[in-house]
């Protein structure tokens, strides 16, 4: 019963992360399911769906298809849906294909031999979370489309892990890009908002990767090994956070050294605190970035990150927490004492009522948690937009 939810909705699953990453790239994406999984993504996990065009389809999997394994019918459906403008095709799994052992990569290989465009098969299953789907999609895009090169773009940067699931559909993505341009950096490729496949093909020309969500970490590590491109994992929150962030990017370009904001520069490494005890419950790199910026202003306060989408130990400090199920969050908030909690508004109901008067709760909506209930209330968190939260 570990994953039973009594108060929180299910978090955005892996196939939603894949679809969100591929949304703007003019491919055709097919979720192999009976309809519910596709509707879950288009209805609840994708703020761009209404008012945009993207070829994301359901395979209309039926009982006899599952029993007999009629993969040829699926291949024919995808072939018929492709147009001359289709750049690639992606086939994604869901719970039923996982249970019957469907081979998504095999289906994609057979499909590619018949339509002569790149095809991607990903074994998503609906049980893993969206950040794993982002990782899977970015790795697949890089493997297929990124070209080896020794040429580097002057002050060239890639942005990894950027989707509306983490950034919302307000100005956060544009604000980050404009800040980077203002600092003199040239954006080579952004995975995957405001991007084309031609940009992704040139990604190896960058001098540093900027990782803005946990979903981008897998590709960052691959590109660090394969192309010797260092990464900076973090978001420039607040004026002080932007200052540290820029220095980290400059250092990565000059000295080929990776940096994790809110970990490598964090001063307090123990739970013995002098000031306030604070927890950021949400996406790990957002939490790290909050901590990194907040600690520069309030050096005696302790900021802990509660990772509700899984904890990546390579970007965490010792007492960060993996609280990826509801019961863990409830136990934490019942047993620990916090002065400030930063989290999605739906998390507030898990705080014991007798503690609410003594806690400052800062609302920080996340699409993967509260979906369309609060996605219009996602704060602007790039640069000085965050000063009002960090300076208080």
Identify the role of each PLM range.
Residues 1-392:
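An N-terminal assembly and electron-transfer interface module characteristic of large anaerobic redox
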């Amino acid at each position: 019963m570990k994953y039973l939810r009594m108060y929180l909705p299910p978090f955005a699953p892996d196939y939603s992360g894949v679809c969100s990453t591929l949304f703007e790239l003019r491919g055709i994406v097919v979720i192999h399911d009976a309809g519910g999984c596709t509707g879950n993504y288009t209805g609840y996990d994708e703020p761009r769906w209404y008012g945009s065009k993207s070829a994301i389809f359901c395979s209309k999997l039926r009982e006899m298809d599952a029993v007999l394994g009629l993969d040829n019918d699926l291949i024919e459906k995808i072939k018929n849906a492709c147009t001359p403008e289709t750049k690639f095709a992606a086939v994604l799994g869901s719970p039923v294909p996982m249970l019957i052992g469907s081979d998504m990569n095999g289906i994609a290989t057979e499909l590619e031999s018949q339509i002569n465009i790149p095809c991607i098969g990903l074994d998503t299953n609906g049980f893993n979370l969206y950040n794993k789907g982002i990782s899977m999609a970015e790795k697949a895009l890089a493997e297929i489309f990124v070209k080896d090169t020794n040429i580097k773009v002057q002050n060239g940067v890639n942005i990894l892990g950027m989707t509306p699931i983490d950034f919302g559909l307000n100005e956060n993505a544009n604000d980050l890009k404009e800040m980077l341009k203002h600092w003199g950096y040239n954006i080579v490729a952004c995975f995957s908002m405001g991007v084309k496949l031609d940009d992704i093909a040139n990604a190896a020309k960058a001098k540093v990767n900027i990782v803005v969500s946990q979903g981008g970490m897998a590709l960052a590590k691959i590109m660090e090994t394969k192309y010797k491109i260092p990464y900076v994992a973090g978001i420039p929150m607040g004026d002080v956070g932007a200052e540290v962030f820029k220095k980290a990017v400059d250092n990565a370009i000059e000295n080929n050294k990776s940096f994790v904001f809110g970990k490598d520069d964090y001063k307090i490494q123990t739970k013995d605190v002098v000031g306030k005890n604070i927890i950021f419950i949400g996406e790990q790199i957002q939490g790290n970035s909050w901590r990194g910026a907040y600690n520069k202003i309030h050096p005696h306060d302790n900021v802990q990150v509660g990772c509700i989408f899984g904890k990546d130990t390579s970007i965490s400090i010792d007492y960060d927490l993996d609280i990826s199920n509801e019961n863990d969050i409830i136990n934490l908030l019942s047993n620990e004492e916090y002065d400030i909690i930063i989290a999605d508004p739906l998390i507030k109901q898990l705080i014991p009522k007798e503690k609410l008067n003594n806690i400052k709760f800062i609302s920080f909506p996340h699409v993967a948690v509260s979906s369309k209930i609060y996605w219009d209330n996602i704060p602007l968190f790039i640069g000085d937009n965050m000063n009002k939260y960090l300076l208080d």
